[in-house]
Amino acid sequence: LENLRFPDGKYFEDEFFSNYLYLNSDQIHVIPDVLCYHRVLESSTMNTHKTENYLDLLDALQERIEIYFKNGYSEDETYKVLIFLLDPFTRCVKAKFCDANKQRVERSKRFIKMTAKKLMCGELPFVKKCSLVLIGLVPDWTYRVAIRFRSQLERFL
């Protein structure tokens, strides 16, 4: 783990670092206790509403999904990352970027659709597969509708 570094010039760099850490670790143990508390500064990217920053989060989460597929990680965990990816994706769609940023959002849309199709072929429960049909067709619209009915949907998913 000596050569691991947070990537330069990326927002949400901890997401990229987590991917590299996962790939370079022999074992990972989950500790279900609080080990430390942290305070988020007002100037932190965690508090930003600058949508361009979310483009890096799209890249990091897509990278994680690719890692999960490549390493045979559970489809359920991959599904969870895909669902998490829909929030920053929807923010970026609403921003209506131009040029290179617009192309990044379009690539993300194709990636989301491809991932939904792959997961539909797997062993996920029927309800999750049904949600993937909508995600595969219109990911940003699906997220906006789902977030409105989140509490009811969580009972099924």
Locations of the language-model features?
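Amphipathic, positively biased hydrophobic alpha-helical segments used for protein targeting
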Residues: 14, 83, 147-150
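A general structural signal for well-ordered secondary-structure junctions
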Residues: 27-28, 74, 125
